[in-house]
Amino acid sequence: MEFFFYSSSLATIVFTVCSIFSRNLMYSLLYLILSFVFTSCVFFSLGATFAAALEVIIYAGAIMVLFVFFIMMFNFKKSTLYAEKIFDKNNYYYINFLFLLCILIFPFFFILSYLYKEKIFYMVVSTKLVAIKLFSDYILVIELSSIVLLSALIIVSHIGKIRR
């Protein structure tokens, strides 16, 4: 389970950096989606299955898909990121060197964790306990958020009828 934790953590970092430095906006969003998926793998390896499911459903499943549809709808060919102006082809050698350095240092920390026999602490939180806590102690927050979502739905449908 520790190897799964460390490998998904490394993949999260790599895909986040790829998302930041990607020149194509669509690829950048896809890297960010992969970063969210591997972040949920980190949560899963720590025993927080509910947080992992929420990470995939809310971030990767809903928000990022909306971003992808937005980019596809407005048809952006290339992004105007600040990173494009800073990093030219000569500076990519430094980025590749940093990635290589991270890949070489990663096994060193993995071996150190086995030497000191420190295990990752995790506690399994069941979905039932989260639901009981949400709908007993935090019922007012749940109801207020549902009212906000309902009002947003009504406003969007009203704006849609006006534009027709």
UniProtKB/Swiss-Prot annotation:
Sum up the protein's function in the record's words. Answer: NDH-1 shuttles electrons from NADH, via FMN and iron-sulfur (Fe-S) centers, to quinones in the respiratory chain. Couples the redox reaction to proton translocation (for every two electrons transferred, four hydrogen ions are translocated across the cytoplasmic membrane), and thus conserves the redox energy in a proton gradient.
Q: What is its main location?
A: membrane
Q: What is its EC number?
A: 7.1.1.-
Relate the assembly described in the record. Composed of 13 different subunits. Subunits NuoA, H, J, K, L, M, N constitute the membrane sector of the complex.
Question: What lineage does the source organism belong to?
Answer: Bacteria, Pseudomonadati, Pseudomonadota, Gammaproteobacteria, Enterobacterales
Q: What is this protein called?
A: NADH-quinone oxidoreductase subunit J
**Residue spans crossing the bilayer:** 1-21, 30-50, 54-74, 94-114, 138-158
Where does the UniProt annotation locate this protein?
Cell membrane
Top-level taxon of origin: Bacteria
Q: Does the keyword Protease apply?
A: no
> Which catalysed reactions does the entry list for this protein?
a quinone + NADH + 5 H(+)(in) = a quinol + NAD(+) + 4 H(+)(out)
Bilayer topology annotation? Multi-pass membrane protein
| Gene Ontology CC annotation, any one | plasma membrane
In its UniProt entry, the species of origin is given as Buchnera aphidicola subsp. Baizongia pistaciae (strain Bp)
Which cysteines bridge via disulfide bonds?
none
**Which molecular-function annotations from GO does this UniProt entry contain?**
NADH dehydrogenase (ubiquinone) activity; quinone binding
> Which family does the entry's similarity section mention?
Belongs to the complex I subunit 6 family.
Which PANTHER family does this chain map to? NADH-UBIQUINONE OXIDOREDUCTASE CHAIN 6
Keyword line: Cell membrane, Membrane, NAD, Quinone, Translocase, Transmembrane, Transmembrane helix
